[in-house]
Amino acid sequence: MLNVLLRRKAFCLVTKKGMATATTAAATHTPRLKTFKVYRWNPDEPSAKPHLQSYQVDLNDCGPMVLDALLKIKDEQDSTLTFRRSCREGICGSCAMNIGGRNTLACICKIDQNESKQLKIYPLPHMFIVKDLVPDLTNFYQQYKSIQPYLQRSSFPKDGTEVLQSIEDRKKLDGLYECILCACCSTSCPSYWWNQEQYLGPAVLMQAYRWLIDSRDQATKTRKAMLNNSMSLYRCHTIMNCTRTCPKGLNPGLAIAEIKKSLAFA
């Protein structure tokens, strides 16, 4: 008789525990829907104006980054949504876009967990658009090519060894070589918006400075001459949007100031 009573009590405890677990699981899976308003424009429909399209994503079933939400939308709701992405870890710069009013990388931009706040996503500002969130970076890369971003020397070691660099000279490149050319800084700059055909912009100028101070490079005079005109460099008015928005925490504004200083005392 005692064994029967103990078994009944144990069964009741297990049943209550199971019900509590089920209740907790149900609460956990209560949808947490957040609205993402995404810029849409299709070049195949030139008469249609650009617009914001709303999508709802359950934050319980989505990764923590904005790129996770965009991928989920594309995979499950709208396969026509177009954007660039690759590494998903802030290295390649492909997923640069304007999120919540700020240029950044979608793969390292965390989603605000407040479901009541809508999140607006646009392509990088003041650029020609290929489709949806994809900007045309042709001019940006042409400008980068124009500064000749590679080591230039008139002579090399005769024995075929590498061109060595001291630890101190190598440290001068810190904060410059890490640039991933995502264009977040350049497309946040009003001067670049005004004339991106002639003003090189923060990203390209920072790379120009990177080669100007590389102790192994022997084209310093040529590089300075290329920049010493009224448009390529001096359209920078130290607005500093570039430094504030850089997703890698770099300081293009400082690099531009250093170029100006080097030209002033050349």
Curated annotation (Swiss-Prot):
Residues 169-199 form the 4Fe-4S ferredoxin-type domain. Residues 1-20 form a transit peptide. Binds 1 [2Fe-2S] cluster. GO terms for molecular function: 2 iron, 2 sulfur cluster binding; 3 iron, 4 sulfur cluster binding; 4 iron, 4 sulfur cluster binding; electron transfer activity; metal ion binding; succinate dehydrogenase (quinone) activity. [3Fe-4S] cluster binds at C189, C236, C242. GO terms for biological process: aerobic respiration; cellular respiration; mitochondrial electron transport, succinate to ubiquinone; respiratory electron transport chain; tricarboxylic acid cycle. Residues 36-127 form the 2Fe-2S ferredoxin-type domain. Pathway: Carbohydrate metabolism; tricarboxylic acid cycle; fumarate from succinate (eukaryal route): step 1/1. [2Fe-2S] cluster binds at C87, C92, C95, C107. PROSITE patterns: 2FE2S_FER_1, 2FE2S_FER_2, 4FE4S_FER_1, 4FE4S_FER_2. It catalyses: a quinone + succinate = fumarate + a quinol. [4Fe-4S] cluster binds at C179, C182, C185, C246. InterPro entries: 2Fe-2S_ferredoxin-like_sf (IPR036010), 2Fe-2S_ferredoxin-type (IPR001041), 2Fe2S_fd_BS (IPR006058), 4Fe4S_Fe-S-bd (IPR017896), 4Fe4S_Fe_S_CS (IPR017900), Beta-grasp_dom_sf (IPR012675), Helical_ferredxn (IPR009051), SDH/FRD_Iron-Sulfur (IPR050573). Pfam families: Fer2_3, Fer4_17. Its EC number is 1.3.5.1. The keyword Hydrolase does not apply. Its cofactor is [2Fe-2S] cluster; [3Fe-4S] cluster; [4Fe-4S] cluster. Component of complex II composed of four subunits: a flavoprotein (FP), an iron-sulfur protein (IP), and a cytochrome b composed of a large and a small subunit. This is Succinate dehydrogenase [ubiquinone] iron-sulfur subunit, mitochondrial. It comes from Saccharomyces cerevisiae (strain ATCC 204508 / S288c). The lineage of its organism: Eukaryota, Fungi, Dikarya, Ascomycota, Saccharomycotina.
